[in-house]
Amino acid sequence: MSFSSKVKNEVCRYDELEEKEAMALLSAIMRASGTLTFGRNKGIGFKIATENAAITRLVFKILKNILDIHTNIMIKKSNSFKKNNVYIIVINEEEGVKKLLEKTEVVKIEDIGFFINYNISENLVYDDNTKKAYIRGAFLGGGSVSNPEKTYHLEFVTNNEMYANKLSELINSYGLNSKVIQRKSNFIIYIKEGEQISDLLNIIGAHSSLLQLENIRIMKDMRNNINRIVNCETANLSKTVNAAVRQIESINLINKEIGLKRLPKNLRDMAEIRLKYPDVSLKELGEMLSPPVGKSGVNHRLRRIEKIAEELSKEGNF
């Protein structure tokens, strides 16, 4: 089961809703997954389709227990590669359809026809509970979240730009930074930051999934920090080794051309210890000198040795 399916299954467990929350949630699900149908003799129907059985049960329960609307459930195979079941909740009784549309305000019913309402009704979404219920429904109907082991990405899909912007505004009223882009004929409201995805999971009540995401985030951050430390240490080690090789080459050149005895005593002592201990750090080299010298003093002497070698190299065209 995908992480996205786990989140939806968890959210659907919160099914003891007050009517105001249930209508906000149902309205958002219908907006993403619903279809208004017109039959013969101007009869109307409504369908809600989903591949998630938990969402089907939740919608069925709301329609039956809160709205007292009779429904039928059809099951068919998806046309997708995975061939999952598609659950279709069908409402054919015209009075039930009109009651549903009136309660959820997805479609305006007027004498001259039906008009889709692309706003998020303030009659439905007006306090913290109904706002969270609406966002929860929008996720159940048209949302998905990627496996956080791979990437951080959560999105809602809709076919209307005005509605996409309204939903993004609602989400962002909780301090998030969702954005809207167009993908072919759809509009995508998306969040890509791990921390903000955690915040949204908290808003919709997916607390177990939130903990799982946070554990993954912690492990990924730890791995990234370890990699940065290792890379930094590797770079420093490589730099140290290259410097030591360069110093030893300079000392050998001086010894060959003029002999180390020609060097001042402080540089000669430094050169002899470096030859004897090619692998030790500057700090350790300084501690071996008599009297001991600090790291900066060792570095200064080795630079002077390299400078002498460079001048000898120029003179001899080595």
Swiss-Prot record:
Q: An example of a Gene Ontology BP annotation on this entry?
A: cell division
UniProt key word Manganese: no
Signal peptide limits: none
MF GO annotations: DNA binding; endonuclease activity
Keywords per UniProt: Cell cycle, Cell division, DNA-binding
What role is this protein assigned? Answer: Involved in cell division and chromosome segregation.
Q: What is this protein called?
A: Probable cell division protein WhiA
Q: In the record, what lineage is assigned to the organism producing the protein?
A: Bacteria, Bacillati, Bacillota, Clostridia, Eubacteriales
